[in-house]
Amino acid sequence: MIVGTVADLQGRVEVVLRIADQDDRTIECVVDTGFQGELALPPAIVALLGLPTGGRMWAKLADDSHASVPVFSADILWDDQEVRVTVMAMGSRPLLGTELLQGFNLSADFEEDGQLLLTPL
């Protein structure tokens, strides 16, 4: 089970990134059910972390436009397991998408400091 919080009416989950030759980094991500990828991080954070590049891919944005965005790989701790994910370098805040939510039930108490739970199906 993964436990998060609700703040400013947004579900949030902390994601631990495991990067070679660095200490683990914890990043708070907004759970975005409209984002079908795994993780999206602002380009400045991706650069700071020094993630290995994976090229570019097309992304459909919230305004229905399309953009070619750089992608990177990262290992994260997800429900106590190390998992390799694709990170899209885009946007202004870290997002966790539905590809990581597959196989989980999402429930949230939508009030300030409410609890968000991701439980395996």
Predicted feature locations:
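Pepsin/retropepsin-fold aspartyl endopeptidases
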Residues: M1-L121
